[in-house]
UniProtKB/Swiss-Prot annotation:
Gene Ontology BP terms: acute-phase response
Keyword entries, A-Z: Acute phase, Calcium, Metal-binding, Secreted
Record organism: Gadus morhua (Atlantic cod)
Post-translational modification: Glycosylated.
Entry keyword Calcium: yes
Official protein name in the record: C-reactive protein P2 subunit 4
Role this protein plays: Displays several functions associated with host defense: it promotes agglutination, bacterial capsular swelling, phagocytosis, and complement fixation through its calcium-dependent binding to phosphorylcholine.
GO molecular function: metal ion binding
Amino acid sequence: GRSLVFPEETANSFVELFPAKELSL
């Protein structure tokens, strides 16, 4: 997942915890 608005796979669930803008993903 790249953001809280776009949840994807559980493998990327750790990314959902933070805004995509801060991770620059």
